[in-house]
């Protein structure tokens, strides 16, 4: 997605050969025009898949997920990372290790919002090692929901997340695929157009 690549090039900050900071438009401050376009793109990619729900993880996945939900006209459910006074029973849970925070947490979704009749699109802001994605897939599996695929805003293709999800049989659609963050520079994967 050209608009997203331009945003990454112009406003993304390479902190190391593993970490890209995008808090100017995605992780802290949110660019609503960009999020709208991201939602439209995910809707276009998954419009024939019978999506009934979108699931994501708090908090950076929420904006792109809501925009995709709006475009597809389906509800969005986000997995919580922290305990909530109102989210206490009938929980679907998974353990997830955060690459950027270097901490393991338990994510949870109420089973009243996800079930066996659902066909879900899983959306997240980043795909690195695939831990959050695998955790969300595990929650969908517990609910006996079908996973249509993963919509990833930014994929770090030099890390094993995509390969792990593909080996598990999942479809992965990433709007920006980063090949490298070496020498403080973002290098994108060259996509072959068919």
From Swiss-Prot:
InterPro entries: PRibTrfase_dom, PRTase-like, Pur/Pyrimidine_PRTase, Xanthine_PRibTrfase. GO terms for cellular component: cytoplasm. It comes from Bacillus pumilus (strain SAFR-032). Its main location: cytoplasm. Keywords: Cytoplasm, Glycosyltransferase, Purine salvage, Transferase. It is found in: Cytoplasm. CDD domains: PRTases_typeI. This is Xanthine phosphoribosyltransferase. 5-phospho-alpha-D-ribose 1-diphosphate binds at residues 128-132. Pathway: Purine metabolism; XMP biosynthesis via salvage pathway; XMP from xanthine: step 1/1. GO terms for molecular function: xanthine phosphoribosyltransferase activity. Xanthine binds at residues 20, 27, 156.
